[in-house]
C-alpha cells in the first residue's frame, strides 16, 4: 500500500493569540522594551485551526501525511535581531511540535531557524539540535537570504554555512531551501521572490562543489525548483562552460525538487525533465495560491491530481508520493517503520 506524503506544508492559519503576540513582540523591540510573555494557547485552539484547514484538505484530497513547518512568509528573520528571532523561532517551532503531538499520524515537524541577517549560524545550530533531539523534528527550512529580498548573504557554497551543514550531517536531516517574506518593494514574495530564490540557490550550488565536502547533505528546492526545470538546458550548458561535471554528477545526488507547481503542464514538464528519483510530492496547501482554477474547477494547489494524471509507471508514482521522501528524510522513514509502515 502506497502512502501519500506531502513534503511541503506550512502552518498558515494559526491561533489568533500567536499572531497577536508576534505583533506585540515587534512593537516591544521597536520601543526598546522586553517582549510580553508568550500566551497560553489551548489544544482545542490548535485543533480548530488544523481540523478546519490542512487536516480537512489532506483527507479530502486523499493524502496521508504532511511534513509541517511554520508559516514561511512569517519566519521573517530580518525583523529585529537575535533577541527577536530566537524566541520567535522557538515559539513557532513549539507550536508545530504541539500539532504533531495532537495529530502524530498525519504530521511530521520541520523547523524554522533564527537566521538574523547580522548573525552567524550559532543560534540556528542550537535551534536545529533542540527541534530534532527534543521535539522529534525530521528536517529544517534553511533561508539562503535572511535579509528578505536583497541577497547580501554569502552563497550556499560559502564556508559561512559549513558549521550548520556539519550539524545537519551529524543529525542526518535535510533542509528545504526556503526564503521568507520580501521587504524589497520590487519583489513580490510568492510570485517573484520565492521562485527567484529557488533558482538562485540552484545556480549557487552549480557554481561550487559543496557536495564534495558534504556528500550526504540533502537539499529540497521547493516550488518545483523555481525556473530550473524549464531552463534545464541552460543550466547544463552553464555547467559545461564553467568546467563543472554534469549536473547529474555534481548536484542531483543531493538536490531534490518538490511538486508545488500549480498546473498540469508544469508538472508534466517537471516529470519529463527531472529524474524521477529527484522529485518529491508537495503541495504547500493553504499557502501561496489558495483559489480554484477556473479552467479545471479544482484548487490550484491540489497537486496530487497532477501527479495522478502523469503518464508514468506505478513504481515512478510511488517514488514521488512516498519512496523519495522517505529516502530524503530518514528520520521520517524511521518513525514510519516504527509504526509498521
Curated annotation (Swiss-Prot):
Zn(2+) binds at residues 8, 10, 178. The keyword Protein transport does not apply. InterPro entries: ACMSD, Amidohydro-rel, Metal_Hydrolase. Substrate binds at residues 71-73, 194, 223, 290. GO terms for cellular component: cytoplasm. Belongs to the metallo-dependent hydrolases superfamily. This is 2-keto-4-carboxy-3-hexenedioate hydratase.
